[in-house]
């Protein structure tokens, strides 16, 4: 095979960095978008929307009890096209950390600084790597190895349907790496139970006690794909008009319930019921067998105003606020 190039990086001082290496049973995870997590003017950090901004928020995450963060794509991708790409899915430059997420303009250094700071705080870093179908198995595996060895990343979230994912589970170089996959079974069952669908007890009991096998499955009721937890109890239907697709995009089946009023409400009974439902949802996630994962902002009622697909909303709608 012809060698077309090699990856070179400057020397970096990891200062005896040690990976926390928690058992899955001891993990409380937190799903965030690096830009959206601190981009809002009220985020109270100086380096808004960057890896450095995440570092500034580490004391908050520790106080919250988080010891693992799940980062949406942090590699280079095209943000501007026919439709803005805020999330980062699609074709990308997987081996290059995103320079726009760096306060100093050097994505390599900033990502390493973030990982090192997280480890010093006792927090693991898991990167979402949703490789496109045109990426070969070998390229995907090499990319995972690269981030593991060069950036000391603790794990990855992979597409369960891709051949590369199956290969990763058997790769010796990734033996001690946490390899996770998205599964919506827990989410859908618990949402239906929360809103009072009939005949859910047996399924709920199963998923409260279910543990994944080789695949690293984590439990969540909300993720970036869909409603936030506040919106889950505030809207019966999606409101994605701002995306410019006539409200045709995003999941149609959300298993949500607005508790008696669509959208924001000042009715005391509605607000009280919504607060109880939020607590019920968090109770189910945190006490079920398996690894719980919270969506950034759910802990204080972040809302996307009923938009359940903010893939193009690099603005207060898609930011945590």
What do these predicted regions represent?
Residues 1-99, 204, 215-229, 235-252:
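N-terminal structural segment of carbohydrate-active enzymes
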Residues 1-30, 35, 49, 56-65, ...:
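Carbohydrate-interacting/catalytic domains
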Residues 75-77, 100, 129-133, 162-164, ...:
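Active-site-proximal loop/turn and secondary-structure-junction residues that shape catalytic pockets
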Residues 43-50, 77-120, 124, 133-150, ...:
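Aromatic- and acidic-residue-enriched carbohydrate-binding clefts of CAZyme catalytic domains
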Residues 28-30, 69-71, 125-127, 156, ...:
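Hydrophobic faces of well-ordered beta-strands that scaffold small-molecule active sites
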Residues 152, 164-296, 309-313:
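Conserved alpha/beta catalytic core and glycan-binding cleft of carbohydrate-active enzymes
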Residues 59-62, 112-121, 166-174:
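Surface-exposed amphipathic alpha-helices with a cationic face
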Residues 34, 73, 127-133, 160-162, ...:
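A cross-domain feature marking catalytic cores of carbohydrate-active enzymes
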């Amino acid at each position: 095979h012809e060698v077309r190039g090699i990856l070179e990086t400057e020397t970096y001082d990891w200062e005896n960095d040690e990976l926390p290496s928690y058992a899955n049973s001891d993990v409380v995870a937190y799903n965030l978008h690096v830009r959206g997590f601190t981009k809002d003017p009220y985020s109270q950090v100086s380096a808004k929307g960057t890896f450095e901004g995440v570092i500034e928020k580490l004391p908050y995450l520790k106080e919250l009890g988080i010891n693992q963060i799940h980062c949406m794509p942090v590699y280079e991708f095209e943000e501007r096209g026919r439709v803005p790409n805020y999330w980062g899915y699609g074709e990308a430059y997987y081996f290059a950390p995103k320079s726009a997420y760096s306060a100093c303009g050097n994505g390599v250094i900033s990502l390493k600084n973030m990982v090192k700071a997280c480890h010093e705080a006792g927090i693991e870093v898991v990167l979402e790597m949703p490789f496109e179908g045109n990426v070969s198995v070998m390229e995907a595996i090499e990319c995972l190895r690269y981030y593991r060895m060069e950036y000391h990343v603790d794990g990855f979230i992979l597409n369960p349907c891709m051949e590369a994912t199956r290969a990763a589970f058997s790769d010796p170089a990734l033996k001690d790496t946490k390899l996770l996959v998205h599964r919506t079974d827990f989410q859908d069952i618990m949402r239906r139970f929360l809103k009072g669908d009939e005949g859910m007890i047996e399924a709920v009991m199963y998923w409260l006690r279910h543990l994944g096998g080789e695949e690293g499955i984590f439990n969540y009721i909300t993720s970036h794909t869909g409603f936030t937890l506040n919106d889950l109890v505030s809207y019966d239907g999606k409101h994605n008009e701002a995306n410019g697709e006539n409200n045709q995009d995003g999941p149609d089946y959300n298993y949500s319930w607005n508790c008696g009023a669509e959208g924001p409400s000042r009715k005391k009974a509605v607000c009280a019921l919504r607060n109880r439902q939020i607590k019920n949802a968090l109770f189910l996630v945190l006490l079920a067998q398996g690894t719980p994962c919270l969506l950034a902002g759910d802990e204080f009622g972040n809302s996307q105003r009923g938009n359940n697909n903010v893939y193009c909303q690099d603005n207060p709608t898609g930011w945590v606020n």
